[in-house]
Amino acid sequence: MKVCLIAEGCYPYVVGGVSSWVHSLIGQFPNLEFAVTAIIAGREQSGKFAYKLPPNVTEVREIYLNDCEWQGGRTRASFRHRLSRTEFEAMRSLVIGDSVDWETIFRLFQEKQLSLNRFLMGPDFLKIAEEVYELRYGSIVFSDFLWTLRSIYLPLGFALQHDPVKADLYHCVATGYSGIVGSLASWKYGGALLISEHGIYTREREEEIIKAKWVTGVYKDFWIEQFRKMSLCAYQRADLVTSLFEDARSLQLDLGCPREKTRVTPNGVDITRFAHVPGKEPGDPMIHIGAAIRVTPIKDVKTLINAFYYAKQRDARLKLWIMGPWEEDREYAQECFELVESLHVQDIVFTGRIRMEEYIGRMDALILTSISEGQPLVILEGFSAKKPCIATNVGNCRGLIYGEGDDFGPAGILTPPMNIEKIADAMVAIAADGDARARMGEAGYRRVCSRYRVEQMRSTYRAIYQELAQAKHVPWPEDSYRPHPEQEGGKSHGGNRN
């Protein structure tokens, strides 16, 4: 059985929660063959993997969203295809309509090999653009509007024209571009389609666009509408849609996902991983707080640094460890380094990428100040090491800290996001009471053991994979997958397989 995992902007290039989940999932099923379709910004990222690929991953195929020279993994026909009335209405529905004719669009790009550049520069797209302009944007310069509209549909076109992997099951780690690629591949080859959302993609993009400086205000609603249409395509065409917690499932329903397709599947971690890690040095007077995060804006590291600055003034024993890579957004990371220098604050350590086993035992508590999360693996990993956590009230952090249907008690402290004062208060409080830290750590350990074990996640996804395989009459392999000789060492990159 071959599973094609489809991920945008994460595995196997970026270290983080979603990437760790994907890597763990592949490792849980050595009997299955996996291919990875990786959606990335451009070919400059090609092949720069942050993970060593497991032996049952036989292919990595890349889709570049910002590469005007890329042709989707195949050579395009040189002729100009004139749209039929049905095809024109399908493309119009993508831009204007509420209900998109995705099947006609898929056929247009895959079977008729529509030239994306010629379409965007041609009369059919111009006619659609003029209609949108007259309906909604008549007060702005038309040429600016036209080029903005082209820029919106260019990355979607790259996703639609790519040459998909043939597989029995397409497993998308989000909606958005991943969901479109999975929907297209499922339509083309008949494989089952599974969507597993860690955060709710549409809401995350909406928040990002509202705050973004690169999107002019007048176009923000249009961008948001397009992401909603893309997500709705995935919801409607999927065989099953999973979420990590009940509130996320409710958001999926609000965004149009059919209720009967939804299922809650919590994350899982190996609770034995940190059983024998080294602890604090005897007599160490410091209170070590660890943030196992990527140094990126979504983790709100600047708020963390500012909060620590004020907490440190109240308790000199505090020491902050920011444990994770900073290469993803070097400009933001540099701003964080400069903020530490400007505050003249002591005892903040940036470690870069680490092995958690070497650090987590030395921590008294963990902290997560994100402005957006799903169900953070780092909190669950901390619980498995009996470490309490300070977390912002985003995603499922409340459920993890305070519990959902259990009486284990609080496993940390919850704060509002972007609230320097409250986060500083939480650091001081957790430093002040060692007995409370121990109680919280034990509560977290009991919580992770009861509901968030990797064995439970494996069992859940084994049942889902078997259910979808059976529906497509695909036999379930019991033995470990062994690559064919020609596949040994043959991890490919989509841009190289034209």
Please report, for each region that a protein language model flagged, where it lies by residue.
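Carbohydrate-associated surface elements
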Residues: 247, 268
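Nucleotide-activated donor-binding/catalytic signature segment of Leloir-type glycosyltransferases, i.e.
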Residues: 333-353
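Conserved acidic donor-binding segment of nucleotide-sugar-dependent glycosyltransferases
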Residues: 404-420, 429-434
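Aromatic "clamp/platform" in nucleotide-sugar-dependent glycosyltransferases that forms part
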Residues: 371
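Acidic anion/phosphate-binding donor-loop and adjacent secondary structure
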Residues: 253, 259, 269-285, 471
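Conserved donor-binding/catalytic core segment of Leloir-type glycosyltransferases
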Residues: 278-310, 320-323
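Glycosyltransferase donor-sugar binding loop
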Residues: 319-334
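Short hydrophobic beta-strand element within catalytic cores of glycosyltransferases
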Residues: 388-391, 395-402
